[in-house]
Amino acid sequence: MLQVPVRIPPEKQLKRSLVFLLVPNFSMIAFATAIEPLRIANRLLGHEAYRWRLASPTGKSIFASNGVEISVGGSVEEERRALLNDRKPSMVFVCSGVFVEDFCDKASFAYLRETHQRGISVGGLCTGAWILARAGLLAERRCAIHWENLPGFSEAFPRADVHADLFEIDHNIFTCAGGTAALDMMLALIGEDHGDDLVNRVCEQALTDRVRASHDRQRLPLRARLGVQHSKVLAIIEIMEANLGEPLSLVEISRRISLSRRQVERLFDKEMGRSPARYY
C-alpha cells in the first residue's frame, strides 16, 4: 500500500536548528540563557520549533569558566561534515568566555568561515565576537562584546564595528555581550519567528519583567555604580567609557565639557580621589 507522507502544519514545523560550539572556559551564564528561552518556547508551543546540539573543538567534554564539565555531541570536524548533509544547521553560535585571546584552534575558525560561506547564520555569545573576528567574519560588521573585553577587541580588530550594546544583529551575524544579554538576543529571535505574545509568555516563565532592547547599556548607570552625583564628573566618565578603544587626551575631554584641563583635574581628584589619568 502506498504510504501518504504525513504533512506537518506550518505552525508546527521546525523553525531553527542550532549548533552551540563551546570552547574552553566558555561562559555558563551566556550559554544557559541562550538555550533556556528556546526550551521554554518549545514547551509553550507544544512542539519542537527549536532544536540544538552541542559541539566542542575536539568532541570531548569541555569545562566552563565556573568549572562545570559539559558533554557534547560531536567535534568541529564532525560538524564540518554535517554542513554537507541533512544535519546542516540553520544557525551556529560559538560560546566563549575568559581567556578568549588564547583560543587559536584553526579548525574551529575554518568551520565558522565555511558555515558563513554557505549562508548559515553565525553568532557569538559573551566573548564569541573575538572568535568570529579571528575567523575573519566581522570586518565592517556591527558586533557586541562584553564591556571588559571591548578595549582589547577594538585594538586587535580595528575593522570590526564594535559597540557596547547588549547585542547586535547584522544581517546573518548575531553577537551578544554575554551574561543575561544572551536571553535578550534569543527573545528577539523568538519574537521574529513567533511574535510578541510568545516572547511575553517566555518572559513570564523565566521571571524576567521585560525584554531589553539591543542598544540598552551593559553596565549599571554611573550614578549607581560609582556613587557620584556631580554632573560634570559623570559627563567626563561617560566620555572616557565611550572611547576606551581609542582614548582621548585630557585636553579633548576638557574641551567637550567646557572646562579647563586644570579644572577637570581638581574636580576629578575631589570627587573620585584620583587623577583622571589614573582612572582612565
Task: Give the predicted meaning of each segment.
Residues 164-207:
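Conserved anion/nucleotide-ligand pocket segment
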Residues 138-166, 201-206:
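A conserved active-site-flanking secondary-structure segment within enzyme catalytic domains
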Residues 15-17, 142, 172:
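Residues that mark the start of a beta-strand
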